[in-house]
């Protein structure tokens, strides 16, 4: 009879332990019910990017002096700079400037080291396309400024920074 009583006691202890574990899991689930959802409904909602976000590169053709510093500091030698030497004024004249965003790693070295600040990072990050050759931007495509997410009335913007509590 003694083994039967110890068996019932072990069964009772295991039942209580299982109920405690189930209760702990349920309490964790209940603690998450008051939180805001983390998922963003992407095409209709967008996160406002931070100030230092490295998106598509914007290029100003008039400021460029064709020094090719951007090519030298790029880890993958990506920007293609075509220029012609004007012998009468002894200066380089920029003919073509292009960047293939299918290869670009968005490190920002070209923007940081440009002596004339003709390159800047924008908040544009949508590069989806069916043909990867459309990701090769010339100076005309690089010169276009993207539409700001904040100005787009069809999209609800969500702040990226965590909300701080005063108190």
From Swiss-Prot:
Q: Which residues form the 4Fe-4S ferredoxin-type domain?
A: 55-84, 95-124
From the UniProt record, list the reaction(s) this protein catalyses: a plastoquinone + NADH + (n+1) H(+)(in) = a plastoquinol + NAD(+) + n H(+)(out); a plastoquinone + NADPH + (n+1) H(+)(in) = a plastoquinol + NADP(+) + n H(+)(out)
Provide the residue positions that the database annotates as binding [4Fe-4S] cluster 2: 74, 104, 107, 110
Q: Which Pfam families does the record match to this protein? A: Fer4_9
Q: Which GO terms describe its molecular function?
A: 4 iron, 4 sulfur cluster binding; iron ion binding; NADH dehydrogenase (ubiquinone) activity; quinone binding
Question: Can you name this protein?
Answer: NAD(P)H-quinone oxidoreductase subunit I, chloroplastic
Q: How does it assemble?
A: NDH is composed of at least 16 different subunits, 5 of which are encoded in the nucleus.
Q: How is the cofactor bound?
A: Binds 2 [4Fe-4S] clusters per subunit.
- Protein encoded by which gene: ndhI
The residues that the entry says bind [4Fe-4S] cluster 1 are 64, 67, 70, 114
**A GO cellular-component term linked to this record:** chloroplast thylakoid membrane
State the protein's purpose.
NDH shuttles electrons from NAD(P)H:plastoquinone, via FMN and iron-sulfur (Fe-S) centers, to quinones in the photosynthetic chain and possibly in a chloroplast respiratory chain. The immediate electron acceptor for the enzyme in this species is believed to be plastoquinone. Couples the redox reaction to proton translocation, and thus conserves the redox energy in a proton gradient.
Q: Which cofactor does it need?
A: [4Fe-4S] cluster
Query: Which InterPro entries does this chain map to?
Result: 4Fe4S_Fe-S-bd, 4Fe4S_Fe_S_CS, NADH_quinone_OxRdtase_chainI, NDHI
Query: Where are its TM segments located?
Result: none
Its Enzyme Commission number?
A: 7.1.1.-
Record-linked SUPFAM superfamilies: 4Fe-4S ferredoxins (SSF54862)
Q: What membrane topology was assigned to this protein in its record? A: Peripheral membrane protein
Which PANTHER family does the record match to this protein? NAD(P)H-QUINONE OXIDOREDUCTASE SUBUNIT I, CHLOROPLASTIC (PTHR47275:SF1)
């Amino acid at each position: 009879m003694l083994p039967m009583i110890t068996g019932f006691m072990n069964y009772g202890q295991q039942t209580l332990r299982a109920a405690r574990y189930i209760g702990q899991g349920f309490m964790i689930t209940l603690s998450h019910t008051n939180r805001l959802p983390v998922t963003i409904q992407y095409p209709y909602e967008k996160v406002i990017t931070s100030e230092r976000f490295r998106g598509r590169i914007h290029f100003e053709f008039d400021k460029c002096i064709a020094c090719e510093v951007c090519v030298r500091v790029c880890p993958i030698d990506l920007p293609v700079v075509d220029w012609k030497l004007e012998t009468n004024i002894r200066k380089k004249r920029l003919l073509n400037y292009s960047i293939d965003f299918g290869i670009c790693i968005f490190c920002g070295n070209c923007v940081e080291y440009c002596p004339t600040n003709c390159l800047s990072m924008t908040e544009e990050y949508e590069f989806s396309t069916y043909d990867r050759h459309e990701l090769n931007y010339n100076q005309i495509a690089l010169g276009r400024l993207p539409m700001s997410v904040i100005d787009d009335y069809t999209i609800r913007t969500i702040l990226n920074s965590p909300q701080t509590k005063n108190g």
